[in-house]
């Protein structure tokens, strides 16, 4: 009996999600990213205070979870998808999931921004590894005309097109709710 090689392809895209700020909606923040052509780094949820861009290595089918209202505290269904190869060339790398005490022992202070806590021995375990997060120190310039905007609905897609007079500076706009048939 002969066996065939099976190649399981990893995802080709990384996704950065926007969220609402004090005065801007998640959609407004997405428009700002498209207008400026840059995802600005943030030190929110990052130890050591380093500003980073967070990206997620999610298969398209898993983007559906963004539509679940229970996830809205952490995610909103707005963002930018870019090619993983481009992000890698710009310096993005997968984070290191490990206990924080171990990171303090093993990593130089200037590298700890790469760590996301993995504390499985706790009574209530801390495990974010399902996010498959990547990080890039600083800001990330969008690849010219090759990013895809992610929005919740066709109404949001129309809003993107309206704000850019019919020509948003991206390869396309993907309405997640309609794509997945979620009411």
Spans of features found by a protein language model:
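NAD-dependent ADP-ribosyltransferases
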Residues: 1-183
């Amino acid at each position: 009996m002969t066996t065939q090689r099976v190649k399981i392809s990893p995802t080709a895209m990384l996704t950065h999600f926007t969220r609402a700020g004090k005065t801007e909606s998640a959609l407004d923040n997405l428009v700002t990213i498209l207008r400026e052509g840059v995802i600005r780094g943030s030190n929110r949820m990052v130890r050591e205070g380093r500003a980073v861009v967070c990206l997620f290595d999610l298969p398209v089918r898993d983007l559906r979870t963004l539509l679940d209202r229970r996830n809205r505290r952490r995610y909103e269904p707005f963002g930018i998808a870019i090619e993983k190869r481009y992000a890698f060339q710009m310096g993005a790398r997968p984070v290191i999931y490990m206990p924080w005490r171990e990171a303090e022992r093993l990593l130089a202070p200037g590298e700890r921004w790469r760590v996301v806590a993995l504390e499985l021995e706790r009574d209530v375990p801390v495990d974010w590894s399902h996010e498959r997060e990547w990080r890039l120190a600083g800001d990330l310039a969008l690849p010219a005309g090759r990013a895809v905007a992610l929005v919740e609905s066709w109404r949001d897609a129309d809003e993107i097109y309206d704000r850019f007079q019919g020509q948003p500076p991206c390869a396309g706009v993907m309405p997640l709710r309609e794509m997945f048939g979620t009411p």
